[in-house]
């Protein structure tokens, strides 16, 4: 698995002005919170938020979006709360993480209902902050 130093070095290729201390803190938090979790493939879950945040960096997204990519599943999948997220990483990151969580949270009876609601949620997310949708799309790649 990739080390924090390797990850941060790769991010610098995309934007040398990223605050690597903040991104590094998000890396550490995501690693700690997802420790022991596995993907269906059996790989450590933590490789997923790393991949999401790398996609976001390749797209030229800002630092808050990179941090949101690293932390996009922590409130939904761990004991970490939105209040903790705000305290540790600020309101902007919380809004992004909460938006990504809400985009994937409703289940439907039919495929058509699900598709219509997903479109509605995507358009709503775009109207609030397009970065929410970009994180969600990177999450699906």
Predicted regions and their residues:
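Active-site helical microenvironments for divalent-metal-assisted chemistry
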Residues: 1-141
């Amino acid at each position: 698995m990739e080390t924090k130093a390797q990850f941060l070095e790769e991010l610098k290729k995309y934007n040398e002005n990223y605050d690597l201390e903040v991104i590094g803190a998000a890396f550490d938090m995501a690693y700690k919170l997802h420790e022991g979790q596995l993907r269906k493939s059996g790989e450590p879950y933590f490789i997923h938020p790393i991949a999401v945040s790398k996609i976001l960096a390749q797209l030229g997204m800002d630092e808050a979006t990179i941090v949101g990519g690293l932390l996009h599943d922590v409130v939904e999948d761990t004991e970490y709360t939105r209040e903790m997220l705000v305290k540790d990483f600020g309101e902007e990151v919380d809004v992004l993480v909460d938006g990504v969580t809400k985009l994937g949270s409703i289940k439907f009876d039919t495929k058509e209902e699900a598709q219509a609601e997903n479109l509605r949620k995507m358009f709503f997310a775009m109207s609030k902050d397009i970065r929410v949708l970009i994180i969600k799309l990177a999450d699906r790649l």
